[in-house]
């Protein structure tokens, strides 16, 4: 190891920065996977994770096993039994520019045929069927062990208790639990009327709902499910094995078994197809049945998937392109407060109506009084507005140059 002043100083700075942001990333991951209120925005979280990985790439000494940049999810929460997955669940490699997506497609993927899918903004789960019967439903957890939420999974009408047709002896079906966008406002209104916690976005609502201690309470939540992958598969017939040769064939099997799959998926076989899919669903994202935060591409050949394998965190045969949030400017007309049944005061902005992420908004949350002070917004300001998770309008801050 080189011990000159510059390298030592750089490593010291890197370690100091790592120590500053790693705990924040860990806390954000725990909140994300537990359904608690987010402590940072998705975009801020993505930036922190990218910075953490960059620090660890430049200084491998920082890439310890406990680093949140090396993790897949979060440990199982207290209050639920742990359950081991038969095969590990991985995260996905994220890219944030079309150039990086093209590099993956033409490089790693070798411009192979891929499935193109939207990235559902939900809670990842693993469903284990034994003899065609739902035996275990678990959250992703850390990828090796998750939370046993079988009783709550059984309350989701779109999750079949029994598979149909020609199914394997054992199969793990991976997918996302979500609350449909059309159901979210009504769900939050019922929460508000009952004096219960409202959720910032559908994903948090889904995560919180799936972790209800009482399955009857979970059954009252408008949860839905879509499958997007498989883990362990044992005892499949030759006909099933033939279809398992491709990702497309896997999805066809899911449909034959009575398992819901995404209506927003298709095969792509050129860069133009890939880019076209990204742009198409960037325009349609507010019109889908569920929230999305990106587009996912998977090499269609499962033999090629096997050959490429995975890192300790992500498969090399798949990638997720993350969409940036839509941000618009409008005039802040007033700041008002809403007092909840528990006495909690929530300030909100009254604005000149503006269209953002597919709908017209005239009010936006300011979260709490300290956030108003931190953002420094004043009545009469031109402010930047976006929808958190593409659902909840929020004011990011003023356009100070226009004051």
Predicted features and spans:
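RNA/tRNA-interacting regions in translation and RNA-turnover enzymes
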Residues: 2-403
